[in-house]
Amino acid sequence: MQSNLDKIAIQLTSEISESLSRCGLMFRIFSRVKTESSLKHKLEVKYADKKVKIQDMIGIRIVTYFHDDIDALALYYSVGDVVKKSIDELDSSTFRPQRLNITSRIPADMVEEFKTALPENYRDCIEPTYEVQIRTVFSEGWHEVEHDLRYKCKEDWEGCESYSRALNGVIATLETAEWNMKAIFAEMARHNFSHSDYTAMLRNKFRLKFKSEKLSGCLDDHLRANTHLAEAALNTDRLIVICTLLTHKADFNLTYDNLFFLINRIEMMDFDLMAMEPAETKIMLDTFLNS
C-alpha cells in the first residue's frame, strides 16, 4: 500500500519539478507519505472527532533559493483545483515564520489508485488531496528544527516563552538575510546595466538557470546602440516574467536571447527587436505564448 502511495507522490513531485525546471527557477523539491503510525497518532491527537479529514497524506515541499520566488509560486499554485490555502499574513510586531501551504485535489486519473492504496482502517478519514509547502532554503532548516524540537513537544516549551520568542527571532534574522541577498543581486544588476554588461544584468536581475552562456553578439550590439531597451528589461517586473514562464505549457528554450525576446513580447513590444527574432525563435515564442 505504502509503495503505491509513494509512486503517486513521486509522480506528483515529478510533474511539479518539470514545471519549475522549465522556467529556470532555482529550487529543491521533496515529498513524503505519512506512515501508518504517524497517521494513527495524528488522528488520535488532532482529529479525534473525525469531523475533519486528513488532507496531507501526501506532502510535497518546494524549497526556493530566493524569497520573491515564493510570491510567484503562491500565485501559480493558488489557481486550479485548490481546496485550501494557508498563507499567514505577516505581523510586524510578532516574530514568527510565515506559513505557505496549499492543499490541492489529487488528479482525477489518480484518485482511485490513491484510495485503494490507503490503509483500510483509515480510508474514511483521509481526503484525496495533497499538500504543497513552499519555503525558502534559509527557512527550510529552521522549520525542520522547529517542527521536531518544538511543535512535536509543546510541553517542553511551557513556561519558556522567552526561549520560544528567541527561536522565532532566528527566523526573523534569516528573513532579513534573504532580503539582503535579493537586494545585493538587484544592485548588481543595476551596476551591470551602467557598465553595459547586459548578460550579467539579465543573470542578476532574473536569477534563473539559463541554457546559454551569454547574449548573442548581434543582440548585445543592438542593446548597446539602444540602451533604453536594456533599461526597460532591467525595470521589468520579475514576477510577471516568472509567472509567464510558469503558466504557459509549451517548451521554452531559456537562453539569454530568448528571454529578452520574450520580455519584449510581453512588456515592450519593440518592433525592431521583434524583427531580429530568428525564424525558429519566432515559431517557439508564438507557440509558447499561445499554449
Where are these regions (language model features)?
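An acidic, glycine-/histidine-flanked metal-binding catalytic module
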Residues: Q2-Q11, S19, I126-S291
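Short, exposed beta-strand "edge-strand" segments with a Pro/Gly-rich flavor and a Y/T-containing core
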Residues: M26-K34, I62-T64, E89, S196, ...
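Intrinsically disordered, low-complexity polar/charged tails and linkers
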Residues: M1-L43, I54-M57, V63
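Long beta-strand-rich cores associated with HINT superfamily self-processing modules
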Residues: V63-A183
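Generic secondary-structure boundary/loop-capping signal
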Residues: E36, K51-I54, I134-R135, S139
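Short secondary-structure boundary micro-motifs
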Residues: Q2, V45-A48, S86
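Charged, often glycine-rich, active-site loop that binds/positions anionic groups
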Residues: H41-Y47, F271
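Short, flexible, solvent-exposed loop/turn segments with mixed acidic/basic and small polar residues
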Residues: Y47-Q55, N121-R123
